[in-house]
Design a protein with these regions (language model features):
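A sensor for short, sequence-defined functional sites
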Residues: 1-291
Length: 291
């Protein structure tokens, strides 16, 4: 209906089809392989862009189509339209913790999941969908109660942000000292990547990062910081810890960058090592002492 209406309004509108997986040449298929139609649009003075439901559009391409192959009929011929992947900076998944810690080691606050680019496809279909399924697809730190019932979803211009309250033990107190554990939430599907045999490719390169801000009780100071790692060639993994004594908060972060969507044997080894470092983050502790 929209296709015909746009054509009547002097737009050039073409219907393409998104398959569940790329199709080999001259291989028969059935109607079940097609996920949905996509419109390719252009008009005088308007650059060509794609319309895929209500998904956010970045540089003329909905995030859902990054790296995909679309198909259409041109007479008796099947034509392919390969959608650019974009840069790894276009596909960013940020998990951010904001935590207040008391002298008993109990913490409370919010954790937010910020999905940009191709990561938006993790979101369930439909505005009123229950996001419990998405949150259940993460490995959460033990000892924390994640309040899924009060999760809030924000629809941004080119992203989604989910904010979830939480509470639980984040530190071990003992006689004026405290051992703070840095919480980390990890998508289960990301960990399964280590089981793939190279070579293989993703739909797009990406960034996964985790950030935390921990506000400590008055009078506490850092005793020492754990060793910080960083480096890589095709897969970069870097960490950061900064203590602000005046404001009593600790900032922590790690960032995993996959620079190319194509993974060969060397990149696979780097990625496997980076994923291990990412999992280790949930075991990192920082000691504090009361002055």
């Amino acid at each position: 209906l929209l296709h015909h209406w746009l054509k009547s309004a002097d737009w050039k509108s073409e219907v393409l089809w998104l398959p569940a997986f790329p199709l080999a040449d001259k291989v028969p298929g059935t109607g079940r392989i097609w996920l949905r139609p996509v419109l390719r649009l252009s008009a005088p003075g308007v650059s060509r862009y794609y319309l895929d439901g209500r998904r956010p559009i970045i540089n003329g391409v909905p995030s859902s189509l990054s790296g995909r192959v679309l198909y259409a009929l041109e007479g008796a011929n099947v034509i392919k339209d390969v959608i650019p992947q974009g840069s790894y900076s276009d596909h960013r998944f940020t998990i951010r913790w904001n935590v207040s810690v008391d002298e008993n080691g109990s913490g409370s606050g919010e954790v937010s999941l910020h999905l940009r680019g191709g990561w938006i496809e993790l979101m369930p279909e439909g505005e009123s969908s229950d996001i419990k399924e998405l949150l259940d697809s993460f490995i959460w730190p033990s000892g924390l109660q994640i309040d899924v019932a009060n999760a809030a979803v924000e629809v941004l211009k080119d992203a989604y942000r989910i904010t979830v309250p939480f509470s639980g033990m984040v530190a071990i107190p003992a006689g004026g000292q405290m051992l703070l554990r840095l919480p980390s939430a990890v998508p289960k599907d990301l960990l399964s990547i280590g089981n793939f045999a190279p070579p293989y490719r993703f739909l797009f390169p990406f960034i996964v990062e985790q950030e935390g801000r921990f506000t400590l009780p008055k009078g506490y100071d850092v005793v020492s910081s754990p060793p910080i790692r960083g480096g890589g060639k095709d897969v970069i993994f870097k960490e950061e810890l900064k203590w602000n004594a005046k404001r009593r908060f600790l900032n922590s972060s790690y960032m995993l960058i996959l620079k190319s969507s194509t993974v060969d044997i060397n990149t696979s080894a780097e990625l496997s090592d980076a994923l291990k470092e990412m999992m280790r983050w949930n075991e990192v502790t920082v000691p504090f002492r009361k002055r």
